[in-house]
A protein has these predicted regions:
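Residue-level recognition of beta-strand microenvironments
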Residues: 41-43, 68, 146
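HTH-adjacent hinge/linker in prokaryotic transcriptional regulators
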Residues: 1-53, 57-58, 88-98, 105-113, ...
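Hydrophobic residues in beta-strands and at strand termini
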Residues: 3-4, 83, 162
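A short beta-strand signature within small-molecule sensing/ligand-binding domains used
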Residues: 61-63
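C-terminal regulatory/effector modules of DNA-binding transcriptional regulators
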Residues: 49, 55, 71-74, 86-87, ...
Length: 178
C-alpha cells in the first residue's frame, strides 16, 4: 500500500479509518487520553428544521445533549447533538459520557458510517471562550451536519465547535476512477 508522504506530513486531526465516524475513534490523539464531559442531556421536541434533517414526524422527540470533549483534560470541542429517541431508546447520560457511536455499534448492531458535514469558521462566542479557553479575538472551527446509519437512516444532527488549534481537516480528491 502506498501512503502519500503529503498525507503524513499534514497530520490531519481527523482520521476516519475505523468502523464509525465518532470522535472517540476518529480523532488522532497521538497518545493523548480523550475525555467526555456531559454538560446537558434532555429530551426535547425538535423544531421543524431538526424534524426535516432527521426525517421525524411532528409528534416525535429527540435526545438533546451537549458534551465537552478533551484531550489530556484540555478541552478542544463543544459538541451539541440531537438523536431521535426511536433510534436509541435506551440512550442515557452515562452512555453519552462515553462513545455514543460505539454504543450503537455494540448494543444496537448498527454502524454510523456516513455523514454530510458543513465545515466553516466563526468568531468565538461566550460559550467557546469559557469552555475552550479562547481569547476575544480567537475563532472556533465549526462542523455541522448529519450522521447516518449504515442503512442510510439519519441518526444524529450535530454541531461541533472546535478550538482553532485542533481545526485542521485534509482532503484528497481523485476523479481518475469515474
Amino acid at each position: 500500500t502506498f501512503v502519500n508522504p503529503l498525507y503524513l506530513k499534514q497530520g490531519s486531526s481527523f482520521n476516519y479509518s475505523g468502523k464509525n465516524l465518532g470522535i472517540t475513534d476518529s480523532f488522532n490523539v497521538n497518545g493523548q487520553k480523550p475525555g467526555v464531559k456531559v454538560l446537558q442531556f434532555d429530551v426535547v421536541h425538535p423544531d421543524k428544521d431538526l424534524q426535516d434533517n432527521l426525517f421525524l414526524k411532528p409528534s416525535e422527540f429527540v435526545y438533546a445533549f451537549k458534551r465537552l470533549r478533551s484531550l489530556d483534560d484540555v478541552p478542544f470541542m463543544i459538541e451539541t447533538g440531537y438523536i431521535p429517541i426511536k433510534l436509541a431508546p435506551e440512550l442515557s447520560e452515562q452512555i453519552a459520557s462515553e462513545s455514543i457511536f460505539n454504543y450503537v455499534e455494540s448494543e444496537l448492531g448498527k454502524e454510523v458510517n456516513k455523514t454530510y458535514l458543513n465545515i466553516s469558521a466563526e468568531p468565538s462566542d461566550a460559550e467557546g471562550k469559557e469552555l475552550l479557553n479562547l481569547a476575544d479575538n480567537e475563532p472556533v472551527g465549526l462542523m455541522e451536519g448529519i450522521f447516518f446509519l449504515d442503512d442510510g437512516t439519519p441518526f444524529e444532527f450535530s454541531t461541533m465547535k472546535l478550538h482553532y488549534k485542533y481545526f485542521k481537516y485534509d482532503s484528497f480528491v481523485d476523479l481518475a476512477n469515474k
